[in-house]
Amino acid sequence: MGARASVLSGGKLDAWEKIRLRPGGKKKYRLKHLVWASRELERFALDPGLLETSEGCRKIIGQLQPSLQTGSEELKSLYNTIAVLYYVHQKVEVKDTKEALEKLEEEQNKGRQKTQQATAEKGVSQNYPIVQNLQGQMVHQSLSPRTLNAWVKVIEEKAFSPEVIPMFSALSEGATPQDLNTMLNTVGGHQAAMQMLKDTINEEAAEWDRLHPTQAGPIPPGQIREPRGSDIAGTTSTLQEQIQWMTGNPPVPVGEMYKRWIILGLNKIVRMYSPVGILDIRQGPKEPFRDYVDRFFKTLRAEQATQEVKGWMTDTLLVQNANPDCKTILKALGPGATLEEMMTACQGVGGPSHKARVLAEAMSQATNTAIMMQKSNFKGQRRIVKCFNCGKEGHIAKNCRAPRKKGCWKCGREGHQMKDCTERQANFLGKIWPSNKGRPGNFIQNRPEPSAPPAESFRFGEETTPSPKQEQKDEGLYPPLASLKSLFGNDP
């Protein structure tokens, strides 16, 4: 402990013990805080010996400061302790920890301002690949072969898919028109697309010349001429002129302007190489929802529309063009669902497990429906049983509690059972059937059966008058309908 406590001594230790932990608080810094700080530095793999000097404390502060936002409370307490110790070494009077932190922040801000001012006085350019050499001159660094190789590889693998545009923008950061032309000239194939790109560049250059006419008269000494459309495209300007425009005061960003023209042409080419519109992107019956979303957003990337329109397409068409299984789930989520919620809800839809689950649910519902129908049919077909012994309903003779009836249950006579009964039942007319008297009572009794078909009459247009004998015979066969005897014969 003695070695760790030897960080401060004499007047510095007295000044240390006068500083309060919090503004207006009673607790003050003690020797134990230095011992704790030494142990914490060892835990963070830092040298505790740095606490003995102000320069060492500054180095520790530089190491700890980037981790303050994500660090623990112990780390923040260690940072505060080192800040107070730094001003004790500097012999700057502070009353508490808060005042020490405010002074440290003020000192760091002044240091940043001095650094920025020195950088501005030197005139160091931020335009890469245009840099300043040791003599203070602005020089150009050509694109590296690795950058060109990456660009060519993208064109060969992706052709002109939507991801080519951000790749071109990243590789051409800070490039001059000459660098951009070098990148375009390295594209070997796709000459039809390159010709479309040239046409777009020429149109934009002509529009630039129309909006920025040439100034009349000579150019004042010490000034550079205004760039024309062909100068921006790098066809009529030298590399030195391009550097002067890009680093002048005020600068003319010819590289960025030419880059925007190229990206405009690339958008048209991407549109041509992606003939499928966003309206044609539909999810297949067995296609996973994730693959469908990938195709949807890849096509949406090539659409020439504003961000608001693309947002509407995402909210509407993504759900509308999904397959029925996913569409049911997405509609249940509601219109405010995020893409993450959609992906999670539709995960596995369309796969074998989902199909098996849907089929099992359908079969279960069909089985339940069939069981319910069978139950309902049995309920409708249930008939009322009647006891042959007592004649009451609700039970059968086997379970009847009444005294057993003697004799036949059909005719009531003893000596035989119902199955051996010879007594015939009467029909609904009260007669025993079959009858020994010929025709049943509900048939016409005296009608003669014809033995031959009737003779045909060949006298056309003549009216035949029935004979009196025939009339009497017909009256005998067909009595008046008012008599029930005509229907039932000799029935009583």
UniProtKB/Swiss-Prot annotation:
SUPFAM superfamilies: Retroviral matrix proteins, Retrovirus capsid dimerization domain-like, Retrovirus capsid protein, N-terminal core domain, Retrovirus zinc finger-like domains. PANTHER family: ENDOGENOUS RETROVIRUS GROUP K MEMBER 24 GAG POLYPROTEIN-RELATED (PTHR40389), PTHR40389:SF4. Belongs to the primate lentivirus group gag polyprotein family. A motif (PTAP/PSAP motif) lies at residues 450-453. The record marks Y128, P129, L359, A360, M372, M373, N427, F428, F443, I444 as: Cleavage. Residues 213-221 are annotated as: PPIA/CYPA-binding loop. Gag-Pol polyprotein: Specific enzymatic cleavages by the viral protease yield mature proteins. Residues 273-359 are annotated as: Dimerization/Multimerization of capsid protein p24. A motif (Nuclear localization signal) lies at residues 26-32. Gene3D superfamilies: 1.10.1200.30, 6.10.250.390, Human Immunodeficiency Virus Type 1 Capsid Protein (1.10.375.10), Immunodeficiency lentiviruses, gag gene matrix protein p17 (1.10.150.90), Single helix bin (1.20.5.760), Zinc finger, CCHC-type (4.10.60.10). GO terms for cellular component: host cell nucleus; host cell plasma membrane; host multivesicular body; membrane; viral nucleocapsid; virion membrane. InterPro entries: Gag_p24_C, Gag_p6, Lentvrl_matrix_N, Matrix_HIV/RSV_N, Primate_lentivir_Gag_pol-like, Retrov_capsid_C, Retrov_capsid_N, Retrovr_matrix. The gene is gag. A motif (LYPX(n)L motif) lies at residues 477-487. Pfam families: Gag_p17, Gag_p24_C, Gag_p6, zf-CCHC. This is Gag polyprotein. A motif (Nuclear export signal) lies at residues 16-22. The modification Asymmetric dimethylarginine is found at R382, R404. Residues 8-43 are annotated as: Interaction with host CALM1. Residues 14-33 are annotated as: Interaction with membrane phosphatidylinositol 4,5-bisphosphate and RNA. The keyword Repeat applies. Residues 185-223 are annotated as: Interaction with host PPIA/CYPA and NUP153. Residues 12-19 are annotated as: Interaction with host AP3D1. Residues 73-77 are annotated as: Interaction with membrane phosphatidylinositol 4,5-bisphosphate. PROSITE patterns: ZF_CCHC. A lipid is attached at G2 (N-myristoyl glycine). Keywords: AIDS, Capsid protein, Host cell membrane, Host cytoplasm, Host endosome, Host membrane, Host nucleus, Host-virus interaction, Lipoprotein, Membrane, Metal-binding, Methylation, Myristate, Phosphoprotein, Repeat, RNA-binding, Viral budding, Viral budding via the host ESCRT complexes, Viral nucleoprotein, Viral release from host cell, Virion, Zinc, Zinc-finger.
